[in-house]
UniProtKB/Swiss-Prot annotation:
The keyword Cytoplasm does not apply. The keyword Cell cycle does not apply. Transmembrane segments: none annotated. This is Potassium channel toxin gamma-KTx 3.4.
């Protein structure tokens, strides 16, 4: 579901959000963004 990547992919403070984006793409979303260290799919 939409928030399935929040727990799986924690976001680092700086830099590489590739893990979040990859998780979101695998879940069928366009991309992943980080908000307060949490991965959100859009």
């Amino acid at each position: 579901d939409r928030d399935s990547c929040v727990d799986k992919s924690r976001c680092q403070k700086y830099g590489n959000y590739a893990q979040c984006t990859a998780c979101c793409k695998k879940a069928g979303h366009n991309k992943g963004t980080c908000d307060f260290f949490k991965c959100k799919c859009t």
